[in-house]
Amino acid sequence: MFQNNPLLTQLKKNLHAKSPRVEGIVKSTERGFGFLEVDPQKSYFIPPKNMKNVMHGDKIIALLTTEKDREIVEPEKLIEPFLNRFVGKIEKKDNRLFIVPDYPFLKDLITCQPNKNCINIFQNGDWAVAQLKKHKLKGDHLFYAELTEKITQEDDPLIPWWVTLARHDLDRKEPLAEDDDLILKESDNRKDLTDLDFITIDNTNTKDIDDALFVSEKNNGDISLIVAIADPTAYIKHGSKLDVIASKRIFTNYLPGFNIPMLPRNLSEDICSLNPNKRRPVLACHITVLKNGNISNKIEFFLAWIKSKSKLSYDHVSDWIEKIGSWIPPTKSIANQILILHRLCLLRIKWRKKNAVLFKDSIEYRFHVSEHGKIIDVLIEKRRIAHKIIEESMIVANISAANFLSKNIGFGIYNVHSGFDLVNAENAVSFLRSYNLNFTVKEITTLKGFCNLRRVLNIISNNYIDSRIRRFQSFGDFSTIPGPHFALGFSEYATWTSPIRKYSDMINHRLLKSIIKKEKSIKPGEDIKIKISEQRRRNRMAERDVLDWLYTIFLQKKKYQNQKFNAEITDISRSGIRARLIENGANVFIPGTLIHPIREELNFNQESGKVFINGIMHYKISDLIQVTLSDIRLKTRSIIAKPVFEKFK
């Protein structure tokens, strides 16, 4: 009687049209069902049958219904697929190709074929780049992808590097130089400073040496500093093929074990590199650091020839200053250079401590990797006095460049940091007040007030308070016009000391040269500023991904399960604690199930950065705890830890 009843059909359509819809991101689980996350506080259950047409990460619109007194959602419309261009591993079954996306929550095989422009032949276990072409929620009967590029084969020891670079669509090889790129274009009107005892201080294995220093003391206690910087723009014409390549790469990409240079290695590591006893063209800056640590207003930029007299290492110089080890400077003159540079460094640290912002010393971790990609060890590296000598010299040079650009043309590529926006400033003030630290919004949104806040926090030396305040701070950025850098404590700051490695520094080199030569200066466009920020983000993500991969390999091979590690809590998420192992720098995740067996009694408060059990605070960001490793998952590059349940001091 009711079959094919147009009134009933229309009624169903009307009810369906009036049913509420929700928009959100699909979150899958290992047990087949999923959730639609509408916002950080609200999510809806997706039954297993409804998960078959979507993938983890898809942005969708779903129909909200009730089933057995529980709200559930039924995916209805795809807004944005999680997968577009992606990387994955090939599986071959019955001569058919499938690809498994390389993402933690995506485990299903996707049917695939090479596209018409892909000449590679794919075997089982190969890694590939693919493009999702069909999606079930779009009405297609299957998920389907086209293979666009083979990354590497299953037995390649460099898989973590190649796959990560492909994932972030980053270059794998150095650019090639043409003959014209190796010819010096700017040889005239350079001061000959080859008789001065310039020195370089760097890591022992550094080949792309950007900076050399020469210092002398004046009778009144002031220090004369000449910073000489490698001059790749003397070889690379603006708008040339190589310049365009550099403008796309933006940075030399430093990954654990090796780097992918912005410029050809025969330029970055030979012709332009300030190697010892080689005559090199440079862009130089003559600065006077007054005996009170301030920088004199008299700043001179000029083109020059120099010849570095010695390539020194951070460790050797630090050992000699600290009077340990057997190394001594090769000549008395170089020994004198080190002593004056040390004095300059101490003057500037004292000045910055009083007038700007000093960074806390931090530990860095470096993978020692063989040429064939084998992990040998993870080394702990601390910033020593020689690192600070170079850092202070480069800071002086960059402040000087910013002032010089602003005074003469009013633009360049500036590093800027705005401190707090208004909302976060209010939150920061409220938080500080709870610790009896009284600041006003007006105060901490000025450069002077921000610096004062940072100095107070350094004196208090409370890592929890420090981490919370950093959470309220803005991110660093780039600007084509002068602006303050609150995090450094300077009214303006522009880098130019790494033109071999940074395209932004090449831009500033060209602007500085245009002022020196009294030529027309062309203001950089906003598009290049955006490109610099985006490329920096992608490079950092690639470095993080490679590190995560290497740590899982390293810890698996070392069989570290059940060994106790000291760790620092770095973040509190919705479902657990993130921490860093102090011994080797590995990031680990401690899920709630390993912290307390009853989920309802757990409260992960992301806002405060604390974990409560039955209302009592047990953990907070910056706490030092002991953990054991319970699971090391190579497929998802994740390390699962559990607390030993006793904090250590």
UniProtKB/Swiss-Prot annotation:
It catalyses: Exonucleolytic cleavage in the 3'- to 5'-direction to yield nucleoside 5'-phosphates. Residues 190-517 form the RNB domain. Residues 562-644 form the S1 motif domain. Its EC number is 3.1.13.1. Pfam families: OB_RNB (PF08206), RNB (PF00773). GO terms for molecular function: exoribonuclease II activity; RNA binding. GO terms for biological process: mRNA catabolic process. GO terms for cellular component: cytosol. Keywords: Cytoplasm, Exonuclease, Hydrolase, Nuclease, RNA-binding. InterPro entries: CSD, NA-bd_OB-fold, RNase_B_OB_dom, RNase_II, RNase_II/R, RNase_II/R_CS, RNase_II/RNase_R, RNR_Ribonuclease. It comes from the Bacteria. Its main location: cytoplasm. It is an enzyme of class 3 (hydrolase). The keyword Protein biosynthesis does not apply. It is found in: Cytoplasm. Coiled coil: none annotated. Involved in mRNA degradation. Hydrolyzes single-stranded polyribonucleotides processively in the 3' to 5' direction. Belongs to the RNR ribonuclease family. RNase II subfamily. NCBIfam families: 3_prime_RNase, PRK05054.1, RNase_B. This is Exoribonuclease 2. It comes from Buchnera aphidicola subsp. Acyrthosiphon pisum (strain APS). The lineage of its organism: Bacteria, Pseudomonadati, Pseudomonadota, Gammaproteobacteria, Enterobacterales.
